[in-house]
Amino acid sequence: MIQIYDSQNTDFEHNGDEILFPEECTVSAELNGTWVLNMTHPIDDEGRWKYIEEEAVIAVPTFMGKKQLFRIDRVSTVDPDDSEITAVAYPIFWDSGDDQFLTDSRPTDKKGQEALNIMLAGSKYSAESNITRTSTAYFERRNMMDALNGEDSPTFIQRWGGEILYDNYKVIVNERVGGDYGAEVRYRKNMDGIQCEISMENVVTRIV
């Protein structure tokens, strides 16, 4: 089931504001890169499509779990003669790029888990890591996503290494990700409901 939550609704433990029946919904994940959801939904008579707005949250089953949250970043403009609406969304952990600001965070001689705990202290986010090597990094005036694996130095990945998975409000950074994640997840509407299709192209490139 694919659900959508209004941007003001943060009660993700319960059902969303509406159930969606997209023509296509694709979740793609690149190792230590971009995770993105692309969705095409019909302009339906029931008006479900009207819930598809920027900042709304889509809940979909993926290789990470039955209910993974993605924040809509942008939607297509709908004209009167259009038959569908498209949306692009990113993992809800990516919200930390806007609301988790590291003014002066200095994990010193810490293992991966300890460093991430310091970086996320006092926030709604959490982390999991099996990285046992110790390292040091000073993060001053950086947002969490940039400090994790952004373009500026230093980043967590530069200092501690590891491979990243996103699980709602939790980030997992292990030496190597484990499990059968190397697949793109697709959903299409058919006569019986939502069909899941698996593609091995253009996704996580190495999984052990």
Model region roles, listed by residue range:
Residues 1-51, 90-94:
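Juxtamembrane "anchor/assembly" segments of surface/extracellular structural proteins
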Residues 30, 38-39, 89, 102-128, ...:
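Amphipathic, non-transmembrane alpha-helical segments in extracytoplasmic/periplasmic proteins
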Residues 46, 53-131:
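Surface-exposed cap/loop segments at beta↔alpha junctions
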Residues 52-58, 145, 188-190:
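Glycine-centered loop/turn motifs
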Residues 85, 170-172:
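Hydrophobic residues embedded in beta-strands of well-ordered beta-sheets
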Residues 92-100, 178-187:
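Short, charged/polar, Gly/Pro-enriched secondary-structure boundary elements
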Residues 128-140, 175:
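Short, conserved phosphate-binding/catalytic loop or strand-edge motifs used
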Residues 182-208:
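Acidic, small/polar-enriched beta strand-loop surface segments
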